[in-house]
Amino acid sequence: MVQTSSPLEDDHTHHHHHDFHTDAEDSPFALTKQSSLRDYLYNNKLWVEKMNDHKPGLFDINGKGQSPHTLWIGCSDSRYNENVLNVSPGEVFAFKNIANMVSIDDLTTKSTLEFSINVLKVKKIIVCGHTDCGGIWNSLSYKDLGAANSHLMDYLTRIDRLRDEKIDELNKISDLKLRAKRLAEFNVVKQLDILRQQKVVINALNKEEIELWGLVYNVDSGYLEVVEA
């Protein structure tokens, strides 16, 4: 059984256990690859205290259930998530995977759409890609990830097909970062197109119960941009 309380019993003696970045006292990151379970639980305690200070009553509200306004379909990239909207826990139902894909043959995707639209009654669906996406870069570099990553390679063939469809326009962009951003935008549009073909989405759109938005997050500035679809 996992102990959930003992690591936090003595906060005063705990601080020296933290494995923060030794090369930068002012690092923005809370944990590192060397952090222990104790560190993770201590940070959770700090987070709860911060939330109770800044948003009192939030946990009481969330304890009674959820009624999110938005379904967020984003990339699993560690540098962004729905919190870039400055929302609180309980506002956004999130679905994330590599390169923010909507897979019509995937049971997880289909059930997520049905649950968020039919049960939770979200009013917005956002597909949000981002700059400097590894899946996008891999496609543009025509890189072979090797046999050990065969499932990943198969997964990313959808990006490769999109790259091939848009290759003429992409090749007109000489700046590689801008080219990658453009393919990320194309990918957002593609996923929105796939969403609009799903029965549960079609029904909700016909009833004017939901809106679909496409966004791209800039990892180097924190700002979102609208993708015209």
Where are the predicted features?
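Divalent-metal-activated hydrolytic enzyme cores
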Residues: 2-67, 88-90, 99-111, 115-123, ...
